[in-house]
Curated annotation (Swiss-Prot):
NCBIfam families: hisC (TIGR01141). GO terms for molecular function: histidinol-phosphate transaminase activity; pyridoxal phosphate binding. Homodimer. InterPro entries: Aminotrans_II_pyridoxalP_BS, Aminotransferase_I/II_large, HisP_aminotrans, PyrdxlP-dep_Trfase, PyrdxlP-dep_Trfase_major, PyrdxlP-dep_Trfase_small. Belongs to the class-II pyridoxal-phosphate-dependent aminotransferase family. Histidinol-phosphate aminotransferase subfamily. The gene is hisC. The keyword Ubl conjugation does not apply. This is Histidinol-phosphate aminotransferase. It comes from the Bacteria. PROSITE patterns: AA_TRANSFER_CLASS_2 (PS00599). The modification N6-(pyridoxal phosphate)lysine is found at residue 214.
Amino acid sequence: MSIVTITDLARENVRNLTPYQSARRLGGNGDVWLNANEYPTAVEFQLTQQTLNRYPECQPKAVIENYAQYAGVKPEQVLVSRGADEGIELLIRAFCEPGKDAILYCPPTYGMYGVSAETIGVECRTVPTLDNWQLDLQGISDKLEGVKVVYVCSPNNPTGQLINPQDFRTLLELTRGKAIVVADEAYIEFCPQASLAGWLAEYPHLAILRTLSKAFALAGLRCGFTLANEEVINLLMKVIAPYPLSTPVADIAAQALSPQGIVAMRERVAQIIAERECLIAALKEIPCVEQVFDSETNYILARFKASSAVFKSLWDQGIILRDQNKQPSLSGCLRITVGTREESQRVIDALRAEQV
């Protein structure tokens, strides 16, 4: 009998899997972290729940009710999870048969859709976006056979633009009775008028992903939400872990979603948007910057001359950006999180010093 290694015992798809390269996994020794679309300063909370000897609620009532009120939906239409990333995976586990069904997404976009499907053993199909980063609806239609879940990020990470709402409607009609359409709204607080939450009554196969990681300044909390019709939520409840949120996480999330917490979040959003516009204006005047793309988020995508050299130069100065060169159609592009005014100035000064 031949000796089998631990790796040999693993599933083939896991052995072949390339893990998602998160900002933290990529590392760096910087002091200006502008690579993960986090809020630049910490928000303080006081824990009020001390019953840590007891298991938490599966779906903490205060968190669900507060989020439902904030999002303008019914509590029965809300599922809370360990970040929106868990929501991505739950939808695949609930709706896709490994080896039979597929998911579909449209690069350049968020990398976890593909990683989650590959981990589970579900086929990934991609339809690249058009030159303006809008959906290629004909391309999607041509590949829909056997697809159970379609992921669309809007505003899209890393490009920063909204998907045309009429294209969303066309996609929802194309998939009616065939597949779940998932609108990833991780950055929707920066453009709340574009949310599809009001469409849930019209489209029973629509699901929406949300998070507290961005505008709520709670990336370290790992708390996300899926908004969907009750039939979808009930199916997701069958596959979610029994205690997805710890008691401290639920405690802080409920506070962040209180009326005072919502007001504070909106103040942060206004501050970030103002800083974003200042940074965009400055970037457009810098010689090594070829193009700055419009953004509806807390980050900016820009195309640079000699982007790899620029990325390394700033990295060496402790300014950590996100390199997007490996994403389809993003050659020469770097993504810059909008930070504090001081952090923006560090970026501007460093880029102005680059030799073109």
